[in-house]
Each structure stands twice: as structure tokens, then as C-alpha cells.
Amino acid sequence: MSDKKALIVIDMQNDYLWDKRKKIFSYNTPELVSAVNSLIHKFRDEGNDVIYVGQIFPNIITNKWFIGFSIKGTSGAEIYPDIDIVSDYYFEKNFPDSYTSKRFRDFMAEKKYSEITICGLDLCGCAGATAKGATRTGATVVLSEAATGCRFGNKKAAKMKNKLVSLGVKIK
């Protein structure tokens, strides 16, 4: 394993952050984007990799009807324009854990990062699931609490943080 570190920026997409998002996505967009961008620049300035992951559902009628967000080929699935893009490392996933994407998993295995920091959306969703997945890599796993949104209540958030800590994730 190398001494290289990586930041994984998860699901910072229009459908979750823009003004026309569904009401269930109640994030404080300016605050979250600012925190994520600060982390992006910190990692880049230190010479570490920044990796972007987007939740993408296949563009089929049932997904449009029943899910209604992050549909492949729609503007809602695109990375939110205020997120700073500092690398070409972008991966799509269909499930909450980014490690379920073979392309992503193979990339991460090839890079052999010693430490992985996760931020983005959502603590009780894809960011939390990816943190769990990352614990199986042998790398140190950190979840940036300040740069990770959570649309769920404090009780559910605390339960997820406790679960992640029990798996060895550091919450900072």
C-alpha cells in the first residue's frame, strides 16, 4: 500500500443540491458546497487525488416515474456546477456503495491508497455505504463530518456514525 491519500466526493449532483430539487433533499447547499470545496482544495494542494462519484440510475421509464432523480442523461444527474472539479477521476454507480462499481473498485485497487477520506452525500446513504465499503480495502478510512450532508434526523445520523466507528472509520 502506498502513502497516497484520496478524497472521494460522493453524489454532489444537481438533483440533490439545486433549487428545483425534491423537498426530501433538505441540505444547506451553500454550506455543504463550501465545506466540500475546501476539502477538495486541501487534498489537491497536498498532492493527493480527488475522485468524484455520481449516483446514476438507468434512463428507463420506471426509474423516471418511481425514483425521479439522478437519471442518466439528465441535467439533474450532472455534478453541481459550484463543485470545484480538479481531476478527471469520475465514476458512476448504481448502488449506494461506490465499491459496487467495478470500474471504481478496480481503480481504487490499482491506486492502493493508504488513506481514503469520504465526503458528500449522504451520511445515512451513499457516503456512509461507501465508507463501509472502503473499510474492506485495508486503507485508513475517514469520513469528513463537516463536508458530508445528512437529510435524516440526529438519531439516525448518530446510529450511522456509531456503526461506521465500530467498523474502524474515523469521523473528523
Identify the residue ranges that each predicted region occupies.
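Alpha-helical structural elements
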Residues: 13, 47, 60-61, 108
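A short alpha/beta connector and helix-capping loop motif
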Residues: 3, 21-56
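N-terminal nucleotide-binding beta1-loop-alpha1 segment
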Residues: 7-12
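Short, basic/glycine-rich phosphate-binding loops at helix/coil junctions
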Residues: 16-19, 56-63, 79-90
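A short, flexible beta-alpha/helix-coil linker loop
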Residues: 15, 22-23, 148
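Active-site-adjacent betaalpha module
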Residues: 1-6, 34-46, 67-172
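Catalytic metal-binding/acid-base residues of hydrolase active sites
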Residues: 13-15, 56-58, 96, 122
